Regions:
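The feature captures the beta-strand-to-loop junction immediately N-terminal to the Walker
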Residues: 36-38
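Helix-to-loop junction immediately C-terminal to a conserved catalytic motif
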Residues: 51
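Conserved ABC transporter NBD signature motif
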Residues: 59-66, 79
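Conserved ABC nucleotide-binding domain
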Residues: 69-70, 125-146
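Conserved ABC ATPase "signature" region
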Residues: 115-134, 161, 182-185
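Catalytic Walker B motif of ABC-type/P-loop ATPase nucleotide-binding domains
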Residues: 163-167
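A short, surface-exposed alpha-helical micro-motif characterized by mixed small hydrophobic
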Residues: 204-206
């Protein structure tokens, strides 16, 4: 087993609220790990702790065998951890191309890039996600589905080893969801390990090698999708009651 990322007893408190409660798991190289759970379970908080946008109260985040708990988000990006955000805030006055170039400039090896090189890399990732036709438009002109593609392209331009995806399929129709699934699988084929939060259960089931389930900040299940989704605790978490014989 070759783990690229490990979370050890990670805990986050917001004053009196225990948002993440001593959660441990590992993401293997070239794996897609689905992170699911009801609203308020702590999923986005978890990837914020991994990416460095939040600081843990306790526990460790280990990346390629080294603790990164005390590193700020930009240093984690330099190492090769990138994420998308559930609430998309592109730079509205920049073109779509230059939004993605920002990711290229501030990701792994980005500090040595010149703008033209970053734009060339950005163009390749726009083609990868199917957004190259809008490269010269201002980002503020994009609709919801295309903003999600932009978020993904910007994260990929950082040259990540680990990609954290936060509900990139929310609000999409069936055809758009299938397109995003195809893109995510192509990302994994590039050798990138992926932790993905998603509420579209059919999509997450077909995408993921394994599932991790949170409820009220606690890990309640982990394993292959079929066994996890038949777990009594998982059923209770989503339905609000245990299934009786």
């Amino acid at each position: 087993m070759d783990d690229i990322l490990e979370v050890r007893s990670l805990t986050k408190r917001f004053q009196g609220l225990l948002a993440i409660d001593h959660v441990s798991f590992a993401l293997q190289r070239n794996e897609i790990l689905g992170l699911i759970g009801p609203n308020g379970a702590g999923k986005t908080t978890m990837i914020s702790l991994i990416s460095g946008t939040l600081e843990p109260s306790e526990g460790e985040v280990i990346f390629e065998g080294v603790s990164i708990r005390r590193l700020p988000a930009y240093r984690r990006g330099r190492l090769g951890i990138a994420r998308t955000f559930q609430v998309m805030r592109p730079f509205p006055d920049l073109t779509v191309l230059d939004n993605v170039a920002v990711g290229a400039l501030f990701g792994a090896t980005g500090h040595s890039q010149v703008l033209q090189d970053a734009r060339e890399r950005a163009q390749r990732w726009l083609e990868f996600v199917g957004l190259d036709r809008r490269a010269q438009q201002r980002a503020e002109s994009l609709g919801g589905p295309d903003r999600k593609r932009l978020e993904l392209a910007k994260a990929l331009a950082m040259r990540p080893k680990v990609l954290l995806l936060d509900e990139v399929m929310a609000g999409l129709n069936h055809v758009e969801i299938e397109e995003v699934i195809t893109v995510i699988k192509k990302v994994r084929d590039q050798g990138i390990s992926i932790l993905v939060i998603e509420h579209v259960m059919k999509a997450i089931q077909s995408l993921s090698d394994r599932l991790l389930v949170l409820r009220n900040g606690e890990k309640i299940a982990e394993g292959r999708p079929q066994e996890v989704l038949s777990n009594e605790q998982v059923i209770a978490a989503y339905l609000g009651t245990k299934r009786h014989e």
